[in-house]
Amino acid sequence: ETGYQQAKSLLALEVRPDAIVAANDNMAIGTYRAIQEAGLSIPGDIAVVAFNDIPVAQFLTPPLSTMRIPGELIGEVAVDLLVERLNGRDYSKHVTLPTEMIWRASAKKPSAS
C-alpha cells in the first residue's frame, strides 16, 4: 500500500521522475501497480529498482531490478555487535556488508564507461 501511494504522489508531479527507487521489493510491487494504472510502461516511461531480491521479484512483469542484501548475514552481524556491546565495547563500529545488484528488466544496467 505504501509503495502504491508514494508512487501515485510521484506520478502526479508536474515533472514526472525517470526512475523510482523503492525502499524494498514489496514497496516496488505497489509502485508497479501505480505506474501501470497510470498507463505508463516500465522501464520505457519510468524505471523501477528496489532492495532485497525477494523470490517474487523475478516473476513481476517486467522482472524487478533489485539490490540483493544478505539478510541472514545482517542478522548474524547484528547479534555479534550486540554481544560485543554487552561485553563492554563502548566505541562505535563501522560494518560494511556485501551486496549484489541484480539487473532485470525494470531498469537498464548502466553502461561501463
From Swiss-Prot:
Transmembrane helix as UniProt keyword: no
Keyword annotations of the record: DNA-binding, Repressor, Transcription, Transcription regulation
GO MF term list: DNA-binding transcription factor activity; transcription cis-regulatory region binding
Magnesium as UniProt keyword: no
SUPFAM superfamilies reported for this sequence: Periplasmic binding protein-like I
Job of this protein: Repressor of the lactose operon. Binds lactose as an inducer.
Identification of the protein by name: Lactose operon repressor
Organism: Rhizobium radiobacter (Agrobacterium tumefaciens)
